[in-house]
Amino acid sequence: MPRVQVTTARHVWPGMEIGLLGEHQAANAALAVVTVEQLRALGLTIDDRAVAAGLAGVRWPARLEVLSRQPLVLLDCAHNLASAQAMIDTLHASFPGERSGRRLLIFGGNRDKDLEGMLHLLAGHFTHLFLTGFDNPRCVPAEGLLKLAPKSVPCTLCPNAEAAWLEARSAAGPHDLICVTGSVFLAGELRPMLVRDLANDLGNGQPQVLQSAAAAVR
């Protein structure tokens, strides 16, 4: 698991494990620790071990969630430029080896977001884009996403989220990456399917399904 040390005016919290990936989650953990200290100052009793257990045990589905290791399958509900950049930064920091294989992106987004900006940012880090809609009236269909995507990366248009997953899964080898992102709605629609399919594959000696994102970090 990732570790973080938090130093405050009252206490040093050394090497605490965090169950979530990313520097932004380390910052969130530090904020939680400071909140604990403020609560203690108000008279609440909170044991250090409880704080450590809480940070290590936290799980947040679809927030840089690792669902398989071979291929590496990541599910993240980044839906704006800032969260997309945080996802990319964490991906490169936590999985440096992912650059050796193909990097496949399943992308869908809401019409009220900066989808063109997101696509141009993400396209520089992936070798193929699978563009799709999802079951929500706010989504932009795949054809609309294609108009916003840069021409430098090959794109596959998929009629729905399930088709995008099946296309990407069929194209991916054991050393490749499949990343699903762009919308909370897309992540919510695909997550049950990914968990089911990858669990079935695990029973057949195929992709390795992980219980938590942090467990994938060596």
Segments from the language model and where they lie:
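ATP-dependent carboxylate-amine ligase
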Residues: 38, 80-218
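Nucleotide phosphate-binding/pyrophosphate-handling subdomain across enzymes
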Residues: 4-128
